[in-house]
């Protein structure tokens, strides 16, 4: 954890970066991207992952094929809504170790969910014995938990392009 003086320096650096790079919405050019088509993670067990994401969280499985780059490996996708896909690979025979938080790694994936589904998801997680945190940090709309391979998932009810109650594109 940074010292008090380091925290002051870090906040000053963030303020400098905001002043230099963060343009007011009216001055921002349109993004050259249309959105995230898909993100792909690595899992240890295809069926376990399907049961977690489809049966527990309610994200429909929309494709399951062999990974064209690694014979025997599966490549499969879940529909996250808004035409966004979450994909997975398994790599049987490689003996991959569980991931750790590291530079370049994924700290968590935040998935926008309807506010009225929060209690239903909590009930499903409780029934399945999945531990979760939230609401926390004063953000009632946010819940964190880990999938069977330790990938941290955040479900939040902020609409897309909102962060901590603030609309980012206006």
Language model feature labels by segment:
Residues 42-85:
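Core segments of cupin and vicinal oxygen chelate
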Residues 85-88, 154-155:
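Short glycine-/small-residue motifs
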Residues 1-29, 35-44, 76-81, 97-170:
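Vicinal oxygen chelate
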Residues 23-25, 63-64, 72, 93-98:
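A short, acidic/glycine-rich surface segment
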